Amino acid sequence: MAKRTFSTLEAFLIFLLVIMTVITVALLTLLFVTSGTIENHKDSGNHWFSTTLGSTTTQPPPITQTPNFPSFRNFSGYYIGVGRADCTGQVSDINLMGYGKNGQNARGLLTRLFSRAFILADPDGSNRMAFVSVELCMISQRLRLEVLKRLESKYGSLYRRDNVILSAIHTHSGPAGFFQYTLYILASEGFSNRTFQYIVSGIMKSIDIAHTNLKPGKIFINKGNVANVQINRSPSSYLLNPQSERARYSSNTDKEMLVLKLVDLNGEDLGLISWFAIHPVSMNNSNHFVNSDNMGYAAYLFEQEKNKGYLPGQGPFVAGFASSNLGDVSPNILGPHCVNTGESCDNDKSTCPNGGPSMCMASGPGQDMFESTHIIGRIIYQKAKELYASASQEVTGPVLAAHQWVNMTDVSVQLNATHTVKTCKPALGYSFAAGTIDGVSGLNITQGTTEGDPFWDTLRDQLLGKPSEEIVECQKPKPILLHSGELTIPHPWQPDIVDVQIVTVGSLAIAAIPGELTTMSGRRFREAIKKEFALYGMKDMTVVIAGLSNVYTHYITTYEEYQAQRYEAASTIYGPHTLSAYIQLFRDLAKAIATDTVANMSSGPEPPFFKNLIASLIPNIADRAPIGKHFGDVLQPAKPEYRVGEVVEVIFVGANPKNSAENQTHQTFLTVEKYEDSVADWQIMYNDASWETRFYWHKGILGLSNATIYWHIPDTAYPGIYRIRYFGHNRKQELLKPAVILAFEGISSPFEVVTT
């Protein structure tokens, strides 16, 4: 056998892995006592649990309040409430969640992230549901449990685990750090209570606003296909599905968008909920700006259209663009190619003749990732706008819900009269480490790897222990890189207990799945639920998949796709029969709703809530201004004059933006203001939620930093005199005293914008 050699990157990563493991084990030994660190969040009764060790935010025990509900009366329609709130969290000193790329930390803000809540209730108030679309990569179990606890403390039994869905849009440009399972905490470089609290507060605020705004209204539904925004990023895996099944569909991606139009009884617009299958990865893994990617841009455009005269994130109309079965769907429609040669990649392995898998990348339709995001997002928005305008089929019928917690590591699946199979403890395969054509890993591991590597296997066994024969056999043909389901220090590395949930609104069934279904998985999943409803009398149901809901469990491929072990299959953590298990579980929910036997269903084993988590590995240090300068001072002024289409760039003496996430009243890092002669004052025209602005933080040494604000002047900008303001918070630390966070601001010199 030839001697094994490693690239410089691989050798460095091996060294880094060993060092990190030694440090982690030492820290865990010192910091954690695993006994007595698990709490269960119940959905009835009052209780209070410590959020985390070293929490930066403390709260008093909740006091159950009697909410002021609308005075319900009979009418044809539903009570409808919509709400939106900021849930951005940290925009610095934290990993961006999604690509898993080392060093892809947040360094600023392209646009704020929002939680959008939609409450739909029967006219008599007997039943209701809350669907919350959150601009995050995924929903963590910890987020959901905390939100449910706070909802119970404020609203009693009105909003519960069965009628509240939290669904993430899956942007790969949002902050990490809000998880409780060890694998995700390590990927986040620790737990950020600052970000966790910010997100929870944003979700809660959006629900509070929707609850307060409940009013009589009507719901209309529409569907249509979206063209020129998707490709299947694992087409060779898709082809492994039966030809007879593939022949039923015209494409290897789901092109259908489903739209709900929400209006009051006078026909005035209230909001929109849209579900569509696409990965928000138009912003690639070189990005360091927090943003909501293509689906967030679609929501931004729709809300700006409906909320004329309001700044982004403000105004009464709320547009939620939610995720669906996006597992193998990419927006990078120019497809994969070898970036060093321009050649086509190998289709099965996504690798290149020269440079290997790290050179095989897909690209979007724009000149850069920003333009690609705009192009894809605008097409999605335009289709949603068209479907919204023409929606005429009214949704009628009761609001119903069913939910269970399930141990996904031990589900017996009856395939047919003679064959029963089981799910597995979680494990990730080798191809998980390869990444995808949307974001390659840099390691010399290819997609479609069906055999392990002796070196990596030995290194894993020495550091983490050897996978059991049981998990190896159960996960076949997956070669196990990480047997996460057998790792429990300091806490389990991936979840065992997950949520399965269906909420129906009339003839619409929303199936909240805790993961990423591939295209064909989603088709089988929807079809099975629809048939189950029909079997028990609820015919002609429309089933929509709400992806990445309630807890994250990676991917869900078909059994056939699993055999190829590309990225999505290697990331199907509960083994080859994961999809069959979910179909069986959701059929049970559909049957219970259709037969009015939900009350007879077991709630299932409650998920844990871990109290003591690994704190952020990035320390808090005091901010400093250069000698002779103050925070907010201008270092690089604006030019006296700009034309429409040019970019204004102003640099200020800055401070770490994560300080602002601790301030509950902080609303923006910047404003672009125009002087109005008619009122002799400055008027805000843009803020940091505007896609025309960018806020970038340059981290220096010893607490020094700069903040650069960019304004890309749009064609719609009015000529006149403008200025840019910067709002920040600096951390001040005096000897033997607790740190304090102080607000400051900076103002640029005025400049003129001209049209010619």
UniProtKB/Swiss-Prot annotation:
Class of enzymatic activity (EC top level): hydrolase
Lumenal side: 33-756
Entry binding sites for Zn(2+): 170, 279, 516, 555
Enzyme Commission number(s) from the entry: 3.5.1.-, 3.5.1.23
Disulfide bonds: 338-352, 345-360, 424-474
A Gene Ontology biological process term: negative regulation of apoptotic signaling pathway
Cofactor comment text: Binds 1 zinc ion per subunit.
A GO molecular function held by the record: zinc ion binding
Gene3D superfamilies named among the record's database cross-references: Neutral/alkaline non-lysosomal ceramidase, C-terminal domain
Pathway of action: Lipid metabolism; sphingolipid metabolism
Free-text function comment from the UniProt entry: Plasma membrane ceramidase that hydrolyzes sphingolipid ceramides into sphingosine and free fatty acids at neutral pH. Ceramides, sphingosine, and its phosphorylated form sphingosine-1-phosphate are bioactive lipids that mediate cellular signaling pathways regulating several biological processes including cell proliferation, apoptosis and differentiation. Also catalyzes the reverse reaction allowing the synthesis of ceramides from fatty acids and sphingosine.
Cofactor requirements of the protein: Zn(2+)
UniProt-recorded name of the protein: Neutral ceramidase
Catalytic activity: an N-acylsphing-4-enine + H2O = sphing-4-enine + a fatty acid; N-hexadecanoylsphing-4-enine + H2O = sphing-4-enine + hexadecanoate; N-dodecanoylsphing-4-enine + H2O = dodecanoate + sphing-4-enine; N-octadecanoylsphing-4-enine + H2O = sphing-4-enine + octadecanoate
Tissue specificity of this protein: Widely expressed. Strongly expressed in small intestine and to a lower extent in liver and kidney. Highly expressed in duodenum, jejunum and ileum along the brush border of the small intestine (at protein level).
Residues on Cytoplasmic side: 1-11
Membrane-spanning segments: 12-32
Binding site for Ca(2+): 110, 688, 690, 693
